[in-house]
Amino acid sequence: MALLLSVLRVLLGGFFALVGLAKLSEEISAPVSERMNALFVQFAEVFPLKVFGYQPDPLNYQIAVGFLELLAGLLLVMGPPMLQEISNLFLILLMMGAIFTLAALKESLSTCIPAIVCLGFLLLLNVGQLLAQTKKVVRPTRKKTLSTFKESWK
């Protein structure tokens, strides 16, 4: 199970690092960069904190999301265990925000599926790591043998 969690962690971390890098760099692909800029204009219009009067600049919003994805992805792959857990939490929150944004824009389910799948894998990783830590803390019970009973009566 530990190997499976490590593989999932590395794949998710690499994926988010690449996606974050794509949001930060225009040199990766010009058409993709232009499309992403147009999408973040729409995303900024339905930003969750807009109800409190804050609406981010689309370019700054894209840079912030890209930086968070890049940093959290790299920490998920190469960071110490505590930072891996924190970066996993940040990515879970980021994916929840992405799903909220897509739902607010009334996008089709097929558009939401990548964010939902990523959220599912991040939650799976989180639960798997939690179970692995719990397994380390809980000691297995010793089997009672005849010698154990004799020692307990003395």
Swiss-Prot record:
Residue intervals passing through the bilayer: 63-83, 85-105, 112-132
Subcellular location: Membrane
Pfam families the record matches: DoxX_2
Signal peptide: 1-22
UniProt keyword Cell wall biogenesis/degradation present: no
Membrane-protein topology: Multi-pass membrane protein
An example Gene Ontology CC term for this record: membrane
Keywords: Membrane, Signal, Transmembrane, Transmembrane helix
InterPro entries: DoxX, TMEM35A/B
Family, per entry: Belongs to the DoxX family.
Protein name: Transmembrane protein 35B
